[in-house]
Amino acid sequence: MAEIKIAAIKRSGAFSPNHIGNDTAILNIVAEQLRKRGCEVNIYSEDELIAGKVSERIIVNMCREHRSLEILQKKEDDGCLVINSGYGIENCTRERMTRILVGSNIPYPESLIVSTNEAVRDRLVSAGYTRCWIKRGDYHTMHREDVSHVRHPEEAQEVLQEYFMRGIKRA
């Protein structure tokens, strides 16, 4: 019987656009390598984590669901070893990562972070933006429409409105 029991939690398919197979393969390879070293590894979905089915004190994960991150953070606070910390994953959401990098003077493309339901045309014009990229602020790309190149401030406003209608609050 293995002395070390590890939970390996798969990333939800919604957060693996065009890469579901790749992400699953990565986690399976990690699990297999741990098993070769004598560990017992149980693979779970994010839904199973959220449902409370994970009891192991060591967790390797690829989670991205907001609720999953909250659970991972709680487990980490309670003394579990969480590889891919829920706190670290949360810091990799686009808006938070942008703020951290810019605030730490790490070179990063000039950025404006806005609410998708606000009028931004005048702000873009005064900042000198003409062509630019608009990216969802909450997560990295989940659909190809989550990253949009626009040619002028009016088009930027239209794209932000589309994001708002899709439930994306920040870009």
Region spans (language model):
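A short, charged/proline- and glycine-enriched loop
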Residues: 1-6, 54-56
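Active-site nucleotide/adenylate-binding loops and adjacent lid/helix of ATP-dependent enzymes
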Residues: 2, 8-10, 79, 87-170
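Conserved N-proximal alpha/beta basic substrate-recognition cap immediately N-terminal to
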Residues: 10-113
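Short, charged N-terminal helix-start/capping segments
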Residues: 43-44, 169-171
